[in-house]
């Protein structure tokens, strides 16, 4: 399979570059900016892209690649900071600009170049997305300008003449961002026309490759997989099951913190896939340990430890553990930025492999979230499973604020189900990234049937996002919110007030705990 390497210099758009490349049907991989030429050769890419970054190439602390990457003979495209890296390496001059460019700008494509730039073939003067404070003041020898903007006379250039065979191209703007009108065409021109890549990356080809890999890795050994009912674990389990059949042992732990009727729905669905699944009802154990615990961090840690204990008890003689690790998790561990600050501890089975001396099978570790869903469709997984909203590992424990009891969980389940039902019936469910109800540790005075009430307050939360990293609160219609509130107060005993959360992320997080 032909591939592209994206060297990461710390840009907020690095993952977006990789995703845009894959949308063209070409496999892309992200590696740190300081990856050695030897390592790059081992990957055998057909093209290299240098990402943007937050630093300046003329600073003493500038992050720069190994000079050897420019001698590999592999077509290269520098984006934003990547352009400046190329300019500096080949002897150009980069300095701080008196005018910074952030946001939309218009580029003018050079019209007098002979022959025409292959990168800008069929690209007219158009709007692009800029995000830079430095610019090229002097072009390196052996390069020519291919586009300019009002503030940057050399906002795109390419190797030419004596250096033409290097096939090195550079853009000061971001072709990966949707605001760059011809961004996809520019990437296509570079990867398909210039680098000569034939698109061969698809969900089908990925599945075929993974089935062979899983079968080879597992051999005749048994494999265990913890299933949550979420998209990632379901797709991972189905793929591994397709590869090794009855060698896979799936464990679904009902921790008493699931949504209404979730255990039954998940088991019914999984039974149609021919997977061997053990349902463990550990709800009493989880709720006993969570009794009187109000701290969200303590809740998460208790749930994590209890899950490991319950999971261990279901172990047979398995040698491998399936995990639904996704590509963003892999990138985070190798990126220039390093691991992010922990905002909340994550409940997962990360401690299981080392603790139980298990080897890992991670069939989704090369995929982004949208690609996981595409693979799931190819595997025949039902759309309502694939398009479910994200659900936190600790379940409803972090949506019942304060102490967690069965009574409070049941109140929340009933209210949450009404909210989701209404979203689906009005076609709004797929228009929001995530929606849920939160039971607050607050009671308020109300009046029902001429009687005073003192009952729970419920908050509704719905957000719009593309990746969950940032999010805006969803501006749902007022009449819709009124209908949901009215149903909840009338149908769910124990709630007399409903509020709607209008906080964005940041500063708030999507989940309340």
Swiss-Prot record:
The active site is at residues 80, 174, 176. One of its GO terms (molecular function) is GMP synthase activity. It catalyses: XMP + L-glutamine + ATP + H2O = GMP + L-glutamate + AMP + diphosphate + 2 H(+). InterPro entries: Class_I_gatase-like, GATASE, GMP_synth_C, GMP_synth_GATase, GMP_synthase, GMPS_ATP_PPase_dom, NAD/GMP_synthase, Rossmann-like_a/b/a_fold. Keywords: ATP-binding, Glutamine amidotransferase, GMP biosynthesis, Ligase, Nucleotide-binding, Purine biosynthesis. It comes from the Bacteria. Residues 3-200 form the Glutamine amidotransferase type-1 domain. The keyword Nucleotide-binding applies. Residues 201-388 form the GMPS ATP-PPase domain. ATP binds at residues 228-234. Pathway: Purine metabolism; GMP biosynthesis; GMP from XMP (L-Gln route): step 1/1. Its EC number is 6.3.5.2. One of its GO terms (cellular component) is cytosol. Catalyzes the synthesis of GMP from XMP. HAMAP family: GMP_synthase. Homodimer. PANTHER family: GMP SYNTHASE [GLUTAMINE-HYDROLYZING], GMP SYNTHASE-RELATED. This is GMP synthase [glutamine-hydrolyzing]. It comes from Pelodictyon phaeoclathratiforme (strain DSM 5477 / BU-1). The gene is guaA.
């Amino acid at each position: 399979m032909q591939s592209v390497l994206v060297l990461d210099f710390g840009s907020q758009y690095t993952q977006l570059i990789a995703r845009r490349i894959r949308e063209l049907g070409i496999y892309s991989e992200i590696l740190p900016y300081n990856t050695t030429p030897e390592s790059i050769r081992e990957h055998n890419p057909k093209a290299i892209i240098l990402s943007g970054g937050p630093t300046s190439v003329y600073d003493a602390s500038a992050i720069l690649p190994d000079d050897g990457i420019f001698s590999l003979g592999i077509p290269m495209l520098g984006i934003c900071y990547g352009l400046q890296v190329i300019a500096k390496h080949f002897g150009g001059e980069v300095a701080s600009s008196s005018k910074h460019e952030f946001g939309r700008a218009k580029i003018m494509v050079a019209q007098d170049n002979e022959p025409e730039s292959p990168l800008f073939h069929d690209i007219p003067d158009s709007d692009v997305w800029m995000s830079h404070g430095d610019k090229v003041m002097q072009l390196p020898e052996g390069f020519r300008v291919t586009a300019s903007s009002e503030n940057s006379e050399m906002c795109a250039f390419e190797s030419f003449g004596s250096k033409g065979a290097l096939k090195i191209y550079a853009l000061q703007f971001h072709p990966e961002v949707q605001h760059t009108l011809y961004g996809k065409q520019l990437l296509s021109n570079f990867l398909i026309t210039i680098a000569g890549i034939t698109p061969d990356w698809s969900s089908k080809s990925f599945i075929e490759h993974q089935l062979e890999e899983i079968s080879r890795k597992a051999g005749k050994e048994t494999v265990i997989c913890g299933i949550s009912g979420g998209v990632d674990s379901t797709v991972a389990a189905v793929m591994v099951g397709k590869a090794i059949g009855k060698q896979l042992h799936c464990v679904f732990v009902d921790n008493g913190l699931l949504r209404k009727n979730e255990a039954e729905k998940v088991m019914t669905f999984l039974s149609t896939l021919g997977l061997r699944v053990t349902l463990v009802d550990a709800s009493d154990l989880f709720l006993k340990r969570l009794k009187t615990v109000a701290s969200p961090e303590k809740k998460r840690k208790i749930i994590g430890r209890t899950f490991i204990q319950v999971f261990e008890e279901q172990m047979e003689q398995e040698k491998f553990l399936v995990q639904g690790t996704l590509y963003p998790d892999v990138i985070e561990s190798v990126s220039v930025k390093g691991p992010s600050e922990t905002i909340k501890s994550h409940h997962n089975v990360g401690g299981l492999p080392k603790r139980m001396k298990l080897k890992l099978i991670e069939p989704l570790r090369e995929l982004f979230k949208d690609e996981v869903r595409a693979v799931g469709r190819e595997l025949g997984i039902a759309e309502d499973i694939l398009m479910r909203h994200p659900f936190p590992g600790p379940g409803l424990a972090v949506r019942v604020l304060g102490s967690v009891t069965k009574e409070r969980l049941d109140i929340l389940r009933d209210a949450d189900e009404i909210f989701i039902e209404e979203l689906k019936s009005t076609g709004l469910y797929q228009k929001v990234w995530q929606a849920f109800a939160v039971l607050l540790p607050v009671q308020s005075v109300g009046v029902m049937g001429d009687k005073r009430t003192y009952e729970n307050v419920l908050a509704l939360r719905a957000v719009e996002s593309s990746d969950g990293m940032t999010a805006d609160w969803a501006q749902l219609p007022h009449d819709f919110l009124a209908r949901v509130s009215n149903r909840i107060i009338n149908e769910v005993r124990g709630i007399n007030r409903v509020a709607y959360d209008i906080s964005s992320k940041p500063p708030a997080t999507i989940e309340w705990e």
